Amino acid sequence: MSGSFDRYVSFKNSNWEVRSERVMARLQKHIDAAENPFWAYFAQKRIELREKQGLDDLRVLHNYLPTLRELLEDNGDLETLAMLEELEVTLM
């Protein structure tokens, strides 16, 4: 097989990159608050997964979906949770 494979070809016109970036931007406030050790771990893993494995934010979010969902529920961040769940239903 020559060339690169675009696993997101079925996501054409879904705006998945922007939607993933928006969720990550909202998660940044939790990372910055550092109220839970997971957030520092998540921030570091995001960097590692992007740099070493070439994973995009949608894949990083998918990898940590259950934990993110639980923490967002616990923190009462229902707007970010809704955005994350929309990504899950439509793109993951």
From Swiss-Prot:
InterPro entries: CowN (IPR024899). Pfam families: CowN. GO terms for biological process: nitrogen fixation. Disulfide bonds: none annotated. It comes from the Bacteria. Keywords: Nitrogen fixation. Belongs to the CowN family. Is required to sustain N(2)-dependent growth in the presence of low levels of carbon monoxide (CO). Probably acts by protecting the N(2) fixation ability of the nitrogenase complex, which is inactivated in the presence of CO. HAMAP family: CowN. This is N(2)-fixation sustaining protein CowN. It comes from Rhodopseudomonas palustris (strain HaA2). The gene is cowN.
